[in-house]
């Protein structure tokens, strides 16, 4: 781990410690891991390691909190198919700003903002910082194979997209996963694990998994579970602005994690997600 990685790890630990809206596994939510998913090489597989949903319980009272409410209001604002141009209505733009307003007020984003200002990576004034966040996350761009703006960092990471009608791309958020599973649109296929990754644990806040959505398959994805929208938004913004690398190794709480962050034209987030490396014994 480099000195920069250690510094970032300490900062992410501070974000974690101040994530007051994080849910507690086994208390505020419960998941059912069931079996291991089939090994896919990017193609659908009939084998299903899970006959039941991933989420067996979530205390939805948390969704009444400001950042959760604002986040959830954004999830129905997008066309999932890449190649379908996105049209942002004035109401949707207002919802984007409402979400940013709610996140900027949280302890986690205040910590991230202060650090980014110290590193001269973000403007100090709130208005300028909001504009920076909007550009990184919500400005539309054309994904590979499309000639018109059909994607954004927020849509890809937090909402999910489909490519060619049979492949799910992005979709790295537990709230969207839970809500779509509740509607019957998600079929959880089981957890993913290989020789280099830790065995999954229902009491940990991270999971690699396989699922289908809207007739498409996500052969392998990884997500945080139970964390607040502001924690993920702050974490990924930090990694995007700080790290010239596309994979940054961090250690916080009980986890060694790689945060993958691909830029799009150096201006927007292409994708970003956690990869569990090791669970630390404390």
From Swiss-Prot:
<dbReference type="GO" id="GO:0016829">
    <property type="term" value="F:lyase activity"/>
</dbReference>
<comment type="similarity">
    <text>Belongs to the ENDOU family.</text>
</comment>
<dbReference type="InterPro" id="IPR039787">
    <property type="entry name" value="ENDOU"/>
</dbReference>
<dbReference type="Pfam" id="PF09412">
    <property type="entry name" value="XendoU"/>
</dbReference>
<dbReference type="GO" id="GO:0004521">
    <property type="term" value="F:RNA endonuclease activity"/>
</dbReference>
<feature type="active site">
    <location>
        <position position="172"/>
    </location>
</feature>
<keyword id="KW-0464">Manganese</keyword>
<keyword id="KW-0456">Lyase</keyword>
<keyword id="KW-0255">Endonuclease</keyword>
<comment type="subunit">
    <text>Monomer.</text>
</comment>
<feature type="active site">
    <location>
        <position position="218"/>
    </location>
</feature>
<dbReference type="InterPro" id="IPR018998">
    <property type="entry name" value="EndoU_C"/>
</dbReference>
<keyword id="KW-0694">RNA-binding</keyword>
<comment type="function">
    <text>Endoribonuclease that cleaves single-stranded RNAs at 5' of uridylates and releases a product with a 2',3'-cyclic phosphate at the 3'-end. The UU and GU sites are more efficiently cleaved than CU and AU sites.</text>
</comment>
<keyword id="KW-0540">Nuclease</keyword>
<feature type="domain" description="EndoU">
    <location>
        <begin position="4"/>
        <end position="278"/>
    </location>
</feature>
<keyword id="KW-0479">Metal-binding</keyword>
<dbReference type="InterPro" id="IPR037227">
    <property type="entry name" value="EndoU-like"/>
</dbReference>
<dbReference type="GO" id="GO:0003723">
    <property type="term" value="F:RNA binding"/>
</dbReference>
<feature type="active site">
    <location>
        <position position="156"/>
    </location>
</feature>
<keyword id="KW-0378">Hydrolase</keyword>
<protein>
    <recommendedName>
        <fullName>Uridylate-specific endoribonuclease B</fullName>
        <ecNumber>4.6.1.-</ecNumber>
    </recommendedName>
</protein>
<dbReference type="GO" id="GO:0046872">
    <property type="term" value="F:metal ion binding"/>
</dbReference>
